[in-house]
Amino acid sequence: MSRNAAFSPPPDARAYRLSTARGEFAVIDSPVADGVAARGTVLMLPGFTGSKEDFTLLQAPLGERGYRTVAVDGRGQYESDGPEHDEAVYARPELARDVLAQVAALGTRVHLVGHSLGGQIARAAVLLDHAPFDSLTLVSSGPARISESQRLRVKLLRDALDTMTMAEVWQVMQAMGPPEEAGAPAPGHGREEPERLRERWLGTRPAQLLATGSQLCTEPDRVAELAALELPYHVLSGAYDDTWPVPLLDEMAVRLGARRTVIEDAEHSPNTDRPQPTAHALADFWDGLRRGGSGRPGL
């Protein structure tokens, strides 16, 4: 989760429910800035316990660079519908098919961006069908399961959800401070909007958290499968990350032949920790593809 999520959408952005063949999904759709030539469309997938608002601070700067951005709540996240207790609908292949349905509903090819859990869902969608995508950017999202320390914290969250209400779990996380992948505002953290973050937490379906939490703890390494596809890749992260250590992300980028960006003074959520340099790095990558680059180092 991004703890500095911004709940006020950019000027001219529209919040609506995107109708797809697999149901409706809540989105924030931010256009290209006035007077700027359109360069492409971006679909953005949030992480565990996150939401579309985790990308709000990127949307205006990307619009100024010519990119329409559509940030989406996945099935069972915040303002998108999903069952409370049926974990089967949140299986990784099902979430990947949701992404393909979202792209089809947008009616255009997209640059796909996934933060953390969203990156692994994005990867699964690309492996199902990479044809609708112009590129894939993995933001603080690693090759396989999360680190041991984060697995322990996610297990604690899953255990709590078995015995406590969502409201009770929120109170515990506020008191203790969250793991990077089990979202609540850290005590004394000044930039978040606590009531909106609580509202987001309460809107997320418990079954979605249980299913995706398990996925984070068991995800296999699928980098070789991804590298076999003809698609430009970008691995972007902060300078520190306990969920997937930065050297592991460096290695993954090499295995993918991906562009690699490290955002200084950012941690697990560069999209909210340092949105301006993150937006610039994203747009620079996509602009390079428009100029005929492969997105891969040395090519």
Short names for language-model regions:
Residues 10, 20-21, 64, 71-113, ...:
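Active-site loop/oxyanion-hole signature of alpha/beta-hydrolase fold enzymes
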Residues 73-78, 142, 266-267:
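Short beta-to-alpha linker loops that shape the active-site pocket of alpha/beta-hydrolase fold enzymes
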Residues 26-82:
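Conserved HGGG/HGGXW glycine-rich cap/lid loop of the alpha/beta-hydrolase fold
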Residues 147-152, 165-228:
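Conserved alpha/beta-hydrolase catalytic His-Asp/Glu region
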Residues 46-48, 114-119, 238:
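Conserved alpha/beta-hydrolase "nucleophile elbow" surrounding the catalytic nucleophile
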Residues 1-42, 64-67, 107, 134, ...:
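Alpha/beta-hydrolase fold catalytic core
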Residues 230-266, 272, 277:
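Conserved loop-alpha-helix segment in the C-terminal half of the alpha/beta-hydrolase fold
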